[in-house]
Amino acid sequence: MKILLSGFCLLSFLSLSAQDSLTILFAGDAMMHQKQLDNTRRGDFFDLGSYFANIEREVKSADIAVVNFEVPLGGEPYSGYPAFSAPEDFALALQKAGFDFFLLANNHCLDRRTRGFVRTIQALDSLGIRHTGTFLDCDHRHRTYPMLLRKKDFRIIMLNYTYGTNGLKVDIPRIINYIDKEIMKGDIAEAKLFNPDFIIANMHWGLEYERIPSREQRELADWLLRQGVDLVIGSHPHVVQPMELRRGKEGVTDRLVVYSLGNFISNMSREHTDGGVMVKVVLGRKGLRRYIVSAQYSLIYSSRYKNEQGKEDIRVVPAASWLGKNQNSSFSVDSALIKY
């Protein structure tokens, strides 16, 4: 798996107490293709126990773990690309692995039309999984967006937008957060009223399979930062794109742009789509200062193997372990964390 990344620095400015720092982990596109459905089905449930076992410790080490949930929970018949519908077992497996915040604004959220759209929101609510990006109606959006997360006395705003929904239109009164500068500008202004420590914009954007961000991505990232966003985290291209740390006032590094995290888990086999990165960011505060204490990424890979039924199965592993040909051993993701 060949991945090219721009320089990504580990930063540390001030000593912090535990309550003065917050760790957030971001993972890319979580998808369930037809082969995954066929090979993990066990009667009326899906056995996904091996999917995330090798990276679970790393995910759970974060205070907040975020994933781009790029499949609707549309009910049966379950299906893969091009019109996804995944079982609740997929969401449960991610939750068990430590992911507690799902992003829903993506180009597949209408794959099962209005019924699947509504069912996804209701299913995640019933599982106790927080999410944003799609809404049942205006009242639902007004009550829950901008999404404010409170953790360790930090106040984090989570925003989420998509470039489109594969030509499908959402039925009134349902709402999807599309990329629209006027709407986003209003959302960011409203977010500031919460007096957040950090504002994070999760963007489903860019061109599939392109390993360099487009001009539109770069311009939009710059625009978001100018509006007051602190972290811009991208998804959709299914491949990893460069990451940038930005310095703000007084030379303090307080902003981060990740153009694309790549795939977290899928059955895609096109070059560079069989893996991605998990990005872990430690956010800090000291008095009135808000800044990035450290930023690091872990390369991950969707490793294929034969399960107990003799069918091809998938598990997410640290790329360093995979490259070391230790696929059948217990992995420590710490060995794959790359710090500069």
Model-inferred region functions:
Residues 1-19:
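Bacterial Sec-dependent N-terminal signal peptides
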